Amino acid sequence: MQNISIVLVEPQGPINVGSVCRCMMNFGVSDLRLVNPCDDYRSLESRRMALKAERILNQAAVFQDLRGALADCHLAFGTTRRFGKYREDFLTPEQSAVQALSQPPDSTVAFVFGREDRGLHTCELDLCQAFVTIPTDSDYPSMNLSHAVALFLYELRKG
């Protein structure tokens, strides 16, 4: 799992950032990349949610744009709940984990998560080689950011 990166695009709240760090620590992933995060992403709130995963929070790399965050990645999975342009061929989280784990150990694989309120833009999904969606109920399809990250990390871990 050392070659797995979690990329959060413009996370809006420190609580979600801290919660993602905790999930990452639970599943043995340490490479967190933040694209234009909220100013207070390292706040006391975030640290409380991270609990014993402050190391991940402190070592998170910050980028101005997604292109920079993915510059060294060999494969990027863009997560989305929306169906539209360029989004016909979706993988499930389980299928994406199988593909990610089949990559050479020296290649970096990124899982890209969008904004809490509107997800990834089409131009950001264009930077990803595959699209993944979580099959949720149509009445309330949008998941909390840290919960979505946890689901993907679980699929990777059970590999």
Q: Which residues are covered by each model-predicted region?
A:
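Post-transcriptional modification and biogenesis factors for structured RNAs
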Residues: 1-159
